[in-house]
Amino acid sequence: IQSTSMDQGILTEDSMNSFIRTLIQAGIWKNKVPKQMARTKDGTQTTVKKTEAEADAMASQDTRLGFQPIVSVDAELLRQQRRFSSPRVLLSENTPLEPPPLYLTEEPVVLNRTSRRKREGKSHRGEYSVCDSESRWVTDKSSAVDIRGHQVTVLGEIRMGPS
């Protein structure tokens, strides 16, 4: 895989999509026959496909050793994409020692949904509180607070149609 020049700033969604598209086009996410780059006598690079027999021999050797690679990525490609940081995606040359935890919980989930997780002091990656729930008796039905926090007047009667 050969990379194109990217600006050294923050990676945009388009550049990440382009990176993923490059991986897919190179057959990394599909089980295609691997390609190798070879130099000819005049110094130009050409793409050489491994034969099916070589690929099958490598696959059977890996299976005997108990190693089944999911993805084959060139290390240089990973070094070029180090700038990308996300809590959900990690580009690395090394395989992880164990799968990541789905939730970072210290105790069982509380059934009371009205309490905010921020108040409990626990962090759950990927989970964000939308709003605080407030439970109280309504005594004044003529005014309310809208979703933007503004005080609004509640209409006592709404007329519909011709009257």
From Swiss-Prot:
UniProt keyword Glycoprotein, yes or no: yes
SUPFAM superfamilies: Cystine-knot cytokines
Molecular function as annotated in GO: growth factor activity; nerve growth factor receptor binding
SMART domains per the UniProt record, alphabetical: NGF (SM00140)
Chief location category: secreted
Keywords, sorted A to Z: Cleavage on pair of basic residues, Glycoprotein, Growth factor, Secreted, Signal
GO-annotated biological processes: cell surface receptor protein tyrosine kinase signaling pathway; modulation of chemical synaptic transmission; negative regulation of neuron apoptotic process; nerve development; nerve growth factor signaling pathway; neuron projection morphogenesis
Signal peptide: 1-3
Glycan-bearing residues: N112
Propeptide: 4-119
Function: Seems to promote the survival of visceral and proprioceptive sensory neurons.
Protein name: Neurotrophin-3
